Amino acid sequence: MVNSSGSEDGQLRSPNDVHYHSRGEEDEHEGDADALYIQPPQASRESGSGPRREKKKHSRERRRHKERDDVGGAALALERDHRYDYRSREEHYHHHQRERSSNAAAAYAKHHLGHAYHYPQPPQQQQQPLPPAPSYAAHHYHHHQHLSGARAAPREYHSYPSGYHSGSRHGDYPMEEPTRRSSKYAESKDAESLEQDLRSRLLKKRHNYVKDYETEENYEHRVERSDRREGGRKERERTVRSTHKQNRHDRVIELLDSPEQEHHHQHQHKSHRSKWREEVEVIRRKVPEDLELLARREKLLAAERESRQRKQTAREELEARRELLRERNEHSDALSPTTVAASVTAGLNIHVKRKSKPDNYEKEIKLKKRREDDIEVIRDDDDEESEESDSNEEVPEQDSEGSATESGSEDSYASKKKSKIKSKSQLEDDDEDLPLPDSPLSVGELYKSPKQRQRSRSVSSKSSSQSSRSSRSRSRSRSQSSLEDEVDRQDVGADASPSSSTRSEERGMTQEQPEEKPEEKLKEKQKSLEEQIPCDDKGIPLPNYYPGVQGCRSVEEFQCLNRIEEGTYGVVYRAKDKRTNEIVALKRLKMEKEKEGFPITSLREINTLLKGQHPNIVTVREIVVGSNMDKIFIVMDYVEHDLKSLMETMKNRKQSFFPGEVKCLTQQLLRAVAHLHDNWILHRDLKTSNLLLSHKGILKVGDFGLAREYGSPIKKYTSLVVTLWYRAPELLLCSPVYSTPIDVWSVGCIFAEFLQMLPLFPGKSEIDELNRIFKELGTPNEKIWPGYTELPAVKNMLSQNSQFTEYPVSQLRKHFQEKTSEMGLSLLQGLLTYDPKQRLSADAALKHGFFKELPLPIDPSMFPTWPAKSELGARKAQASSPKPPSGGSQFKQLGRDEPIIVGPGNKLSSGIITGNKKSHGAGGSSASTGFVLNAGITQRQLAMGPGFSLKF
């Protein structure tokens, strides 16, 4: 906005000012004497202002010369020169205007009046018209605007003729007012106001310059100070680091020289280790654990607490009985005739004893030392102690018999003395409190104690004697070790002296005689233990089980609920653990050759199950044994369903799996097979009856009876593996070498069975199985299966002028195009490829696009549930699939062909092609079996495998 006062420094102009009005218009503005107006820039024509201006001019020049050397610098001097030139031109311009005529002067004054007076009117400020045509007023305004430092664009300065304003027509027309802009310097000022304005601006610039200079200087000082401070800090850190390094070096030297520093360092290391263990323990506690594992641990801890309470009560009862027996023995010893006789003989022979003491004193000390050393050795040796604990229970009975026969012999006394010392040490060990373990896996440390070892020995011996006396029985009386025999010989030699009888009588008088009632003590101990130990249904006590330390548990600790099925090499039962009440699966291994040792098939199964731990493989918990070694059981997690029986139930209800469920099951199966193959394990018996499904939808592979580890290079194994319906064609054609592709073929058959709820190749024999495979997939040849003609079965057939029926086209797409997608067909064809080298691997099948297309595999937890037949107590119906081969030369018959009709001329008419001619009997059904063979083969030979009755 333009300053309303008429100047930048706020000076007010009145109408009485000489520079405001022209001479011809004094009367026109007389009534507005009190109003305030803005003085336009114009030159004064009065003569009195000349000396004053000259004086100011000289003062300005002096001031300019004075300030030229001041702070302003070259920029201020240049600006002053510019303004000085402007003033000289202005004076020259107005000097020419004064020489004009009065009319021209009046017109000029009128022009200046309109230029100054009409500008502040509101309509002229609000409306800004377009730039007018070039005129003198516009030129004059822009000329002043440019010279006063405004931002308007410079215009070209035109020189007008001297008689421009003196024209006749120019005075009649009104002068056009130029477009005003709201500029700070839009109004022109006189020389004094301009001087003051310039001075104020210069002072302001100088002040800003000085202020900026001081600010920069202060900032530089601050930066320098901070740099100095930072450098000092870095220097201090450098010195601290160097001193710390030197101190460390000195400490290392002290540590190597002084053992105290080493001890201190070890103590610090231990403290750090303990802190680290505490942190790890806190992290482990924060990590969420499996609920089943926590429940199992809680049950084990509860069983541990219960056993601890039983031990405490048994210990208290035993202590009370000991006190009672001591009181009875003291009372009976005081009145017994043997005690009286011993006291009398001791009184008579007291002088003899004193005399003979120096002679045998050294021998007696040596014997005592040897006995103490023997006792310490026996205590430290766990194996000898476990054997002697059984014999110590029978020592009183043996001593009573020995005293009747050899009452005066010193040998019996030495054995009695040794048994007394051992029994005392055992009683002291019983009284000591045993440290209880912290974790369930370390509960078995209790078994290492002498008390627990003695208790478990006695209980197990009693239970074994009650259950089966004809089975393996532990001999309770065992021979003493060579160390004890040597001590006994030394005792006999040392005690062969006249004073030995007196010493024995004195010992018998001073010491207690716990062997007087040994039978009662043993009965009471066993009775107290029987009251505290848990028993099974028949009343037979169960031994304490501590995993990780003790051997195999007994199968009697499990309650058999019902039989589930019979596997390849054993029968599976559903049972309940009597300690934890958990439902488990017990698989009994067949021990047909137990006299020759543990069967190799059972060892392979246990080994592969322990090596192949995976979420989709059955979990082995432990191995338990029966009363005899011919009964061995594998304890596994119980899974509710097997897929064979489940699919039969669904088929009876006219149900089938959804595509997402098929993908979920196949994906879990492929994961398990891939894990086995990564661990160099062949399952060799994959089928739906060996696939288990839990209520949570988790598929688990079971029955590892035919599983075997393989290696590189691949060895020759028996081809009589895998159940017939899921057997690969290379096995059916007696290939001597096979590997993981045989499991992949079985997975392909199972995948097809998931899709159609029926077996894909339900052959009755190897011949029928091959015929079904070739009919479904087409007959192979050397082009699609390199090395096909080199297989033993094919080579023998060709040598005998026999061949298979040709099926050129695969029927797989025709049968499954409505049951799965194109990607599903591609996966099925990849799994059922003839050439084992071109067949998909389990890892490659997992990456197939079938599992990535919609619908995606469902989550196992979303799987529907069905009631398990085994839980209802009903025996599960046997699956309709054939049993797997038992292996070796004792394999059983896998199936039989259809009955063969013998036609006239004793020729077979079951569709078999003899030579190259078809027999037309029985309707000419030569395509029913598709196998071409020579004539004269009996029915029994056709039913045998694996070589199709051909001797290779």
Curated annotation (Swiss-Prot):
Annotated stretches, region: Disordered: 1-196, 216-247, 302-538, 870-906
Principal location: nucleus
Bias (Low complexity): 457-470
Residues covered by the Protein kinase domain: 558-851
Pfam families xref list: Pkinase (PF00069)
Gene Ontology annotations for the cellular component aspect, listed alphabetically: nucleus
Active-site residues from the entry: D685
Transmembrane segments: none
Residues annotated to bind ATP: I564, E565, E566, G567, T568, Y569, G570, V571, V572, K587
A molecular function (GO) term: cyclin-dependent protein serine/threonine kinase activity
Composition bias, Basic and acidic residues: 16-26, 78-93, 169-196, 216-240, 302-333, 357-378, 503-538
Stretches with biased composition (Basic residues): 53-66
Enzyme class (EC, first level): transferase
Expression across tissues: Present throughout the early embryo. In late embryos levels are highest in the CNS.
EC number assigned by the record: 2.7.11.22
Residues found modified as Phosphotyrosine: Y447
Places the protein is found: Nucleus
InterPro entries noted in UniProt: CDK, CDK11/PITSLRE_STKc, Kinase-like_dom_sf, Prot_kinase_dom, Ser/Thr_kinase_AS
Matches recorded under PANTHER family: CELL DIVISION PROTEIN KINASE (PTHR24056), CYCLIN-DEPENDENT KINASE 11A-RELATED (PTHR24056:SF107)
Protein name: Serine/threonine-protein kinase PITSLRE
Lineage, top ranks: Eukaryota, Metazoa, Ecdysozoa, Arthropoda, Hexapoda
Name of the gene this protein is made from: Pitslre
